[in-house]
Structures are given as structure tokens and as C-alpha cells.
């Protein structure tokens, strides 16, 4: 008895593992029905080459995940260049125009603002123009730059929303 957090969790509580061969890659244009709720997949290469975004039309919600958020990592070998990322975001923003009111992210409290894509596109443009603060950043042995200076709470000092961690050799 007790609350779910107080109960013993066993292997039977989990979904059984499936052999890897039964999974298939998600790609832009895919859609699936979860019993009255549709998930539409949109490509958004940037953070990773295979990044995707999910639109839930019935809820007018979009799950951007790591593809576009308040502190997007764009500095590793598995990321696109900033220029390619900006192109992805512009295309995605056009494809999703008027289709969502709610944005979900994969970090922080999970809530994003409706204009996050446009705000991150502006950061891409600032990076390309050299209009950045370039704060040194290290993560898992990799060195990069934070485009816009941040507060201790990781919000932008200039009051803007959206930021990119990038490498000058991947613009």
C-alpha cells in the first residue's frame, strides 16, 4: 500500500525490453496514433544530426526536447554547424506556424515559450555576426563557448531567451 514512491518497484513494473531489430527510426513526415492522440514527427537537425520534434495537434503542443531550448548544445561532432541549425529552425518554424500554443522542452521545468525558435534563430544570427559574449564553457572534457552571458540561474544577462553553447569551428 502507500504512495507510489513508497511501494517496492520490481521488474514486472517495467515494459519488457524489445530486441533492437523491432525498433524503427523516427523521421520527418512520420505520424502515429496513440488512440486518439496523434504524434507528428518533424526533422530538426542541429543539436544532433537526427534531432526530431514532435507535434501533438489535438493538444496544440510541440515537444522540442533538446532540439531547441534555453541552453542548446551545438559544439560536438554530432551537431550540425550553426548555419545549418539556423536553416533547420527557420524551416521548422514555418512548418509549425499556427499549429501550437504550448512548448515542452527536455530541461529545466520542461516549459518553453511560444517564440523560443525565433529567439534561438536570433542567437544563431548573432553568432554568425560575431555579436556574442563567448563565455568559456566545459562539459565532459569538451570546451565550448556560451553565446550570451548568463546569470547564476542560467538565464541570459541581457534578458533575452534562448542561448547556444557552440564552437567557433562549427559556425
What label would you give each PLM region?
Residues 14, 23, 32, 71-75, ...:
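Phenylalanine-focused residue identity feature
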Residues 1-33, 70, 125-129:
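Active-site HxH/HxHxD metal-binding segment of metal-dependent hydrolases
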Residues 38-126:
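Metallo-beta-lactamase
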Residues 16, 25-27, 34, 61, ...:
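Intrinsically disordered, low-complexity regions enriched in small/polar residues
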Residues 90-171:
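Accessory terminal helices/loops
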Residues 26, 30, 50, 163-171:
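Short flexible/disordered coil segments
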Residues 4, 16-19, 45, 57, ...:
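Proline-rich intrinsically disordered, low-complexity coils
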Amino acid at each position: 500500500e502507500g504512495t507510489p514512491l513508497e511501494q517496492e518497484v520490481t521488474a514486472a513494473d517495467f515494459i519488457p525490453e524489445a530486441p533492437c531489430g523491432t525498433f524503427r527510426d523516427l523521421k520527418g513526415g512520420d505520424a502515429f496514433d496513440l488512440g486518439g492522440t496523434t504524434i507528428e514527427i518533424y526533422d530538426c537537425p542541429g543539436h544532433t544530426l537526427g534531432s526530431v520534434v514532435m507535434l501533438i495537434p489535438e493538444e496544440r503542443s510541440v515537444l522540442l526536447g533538446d532540439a531547441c531550448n534555453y541552453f542548446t548544445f551545438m559544439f560536438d561532432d554530432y551537431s550540425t554547424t550553426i548555419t545549418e541549425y539556423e536553416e533547420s529552425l527557420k524551416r521548422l518554424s514555418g512548418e509549425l506556424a499556427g499549429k501550437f500554443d504550448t512548448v515542452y522542452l527536455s530541461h529545466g521545468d520542461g516549459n518553453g515559450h511560444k517564440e523560443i525558435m525565433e529567439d534561438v534563430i536570433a542567437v544563431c544570427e548573432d553568432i554568425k555576426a560575431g555579436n556574442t559574449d563567448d563565455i568559456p564553457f566545459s562539459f565532459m572534457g569538451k570546451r565550448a563557448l556560451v553565446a550570451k552571458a548568463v546569470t547564476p540561474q542560467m538565464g541570459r544577462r541581457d534578458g533575452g531567451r534562448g542561448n547556444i553553447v557552440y564552437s567557433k569551428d562549427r559556425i
